[in-house]
Amino acid sequence: MDKYGLIGYPLGHSFSKSYFNEKFENEGINAEYINFEIPSIGDLTEILDSNPELKGLNVTIPYKEKVISYLDSVSPEANAIGAVNVVKIEHKGDETILKGYNSDVIGFTQSIEPFVESYHKKALILGTGGASKAINYGLKSLGLETVFVSRYERPGTI
């Protein structure tokens, strides 16, 4: 049985495990989704070693940036954003290869692109949290100037 999972800390708020396990069952996919609540990103190595069936991981707070140093490769988008939320795990012989991606930018950009008209030149991004980096990248890829709105005073925000 293939395994997939989520790494982060804490994970009590996450609905991923029940969501994906229900999808696997409904689609007849022989797979399991597991939450790996790890207090340190250094625990990732132990998870990989003790779960050789792992094919992929979702990554949530606080590890979207910290996980990058554990990866063998990172997609250009995730590299530019500086955050990874999907890790593809490949096994080649005794070697485990970890590839990082950012699906936030793909989902956001594809969902907003049909609504962007030629007269749209600027966009406000509300917040400066993790997803805002992906949103900023997506908006810029569509040719829009961006401004961040934050509740905290930071350079480059209003």
PLM segments and residue spans:
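Phosphate/diphosphate ligand-binding glycine-rich loop within oxidoreductases
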Residues: 2-115
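Adenosine-cofactor binding site in Rossmann-like domains, unifying the SAM/SAH pocket
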Residues: 152-158
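Glycine-rich adenosine-cofactor-binding loop
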Residues: 8, 100-105, 112, 116-144, ...
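Alpha-helix N-cap/loop-to-helix initiation residues
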Residues: 12-13, 132, 154
